[in-house]
Amino acid sequence: MYLSKIYIKNFRGIKELQVKFDNNLNVIIGANGQLKTSLIDAIRLFYTWGEPNRDIEITKEDFYVEVTSNVDGSTTVTPSAKIDICYMFEGLSAQQEGAFYQYLDRKDDGTMVARVHLCFEMKEKGRIVSSYITGKEENGLRADWDTFYYFHPYYLGALRDSTRGLMSTRNNLLGRGIKRKIDRAGSEDDVKSIVDRANDQLLQRQEVRETQTGINDNLVQISRTVLKDVELHIEQNRIEYIVNIIKPFLPYAAADKQGFMLTQNSLGFNNLIYIASVLSDIKDCHVDDAVSIYALLIEEPEAHLHPQLQVNLYNFLKNADD
């Protein structure tokens, strides 16, 4: 299942636009100011529709403004009051037709497609009201909200920081992938036991024991009855915290356990590491989930890359779905 067509009306600088997509790789080419980012953001609007903390929202500045020059030399400015974005998905599997039955519509050739229509209307006092329709427009059907969780975007913006995405200590890309493999293997207890052993060894260090003793000595002076002994340990109650401290690095040599941190690496190479991690994560997700839809959206993929690396990246992405 893939996004095969998008129709956009009155969104930012786009008065009306329809774009068709290939089921593998799509490259959007244009000069500055040709609204390439607006097209990408229109796609992101739906793919993040079911996320509780969306990183993109419609504001009053997103409504198209019509500027007309009059014969008397004056200018008339007419802001639109409604944004419409329609999405069509093709290539549905039997499982996806079942999961997205509320989205289905039949084309003239008999094949089934999934349709979604997002609408944003400007109301009084600048209030923006959003709504959606799935399936045939005339039916006015609204699919269950939970179905939007099947759509997953990975986005690298033009002013991106892929290093931060790889090094974050909360819900980072690498940690999610490792956590999924641990869940599949049922090895959470084994991983926690490794941390337990490290915990025991670390707590025997003189530096740690002295710190703990200093805390408790002060507590005795402050409160003799309420707090007596405080213990120290590595927090390992949740497996997510454990895997999120695993970070990529560049070893000095093949067998070396020491090396350069990503913050010491070039931005271009870090972009490649991030893209490789995303594609690995997407392929791994398909092992357990044959329904969800994933999209990798990259603005200015050439950023920080030497021309030869740009060619290598393009050739790789062409076959990334194989």
Question: What annotation goes with each model-predicted range?
Answer:
Residues K5-Y7, Q18, D84-M88, R115-H117, ...:
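Beta-strand secondary-structure signal
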Residues E66-G73, F100-L104, G135-A143, D217, ...:
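Short alpha-helical segments and helix-capping/turn motifs at coil-helix boundaries
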Residues G165-T169, G177-I298, P307, N319:
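Extended helical coiled-coil dimerization/tether regions that scaffold
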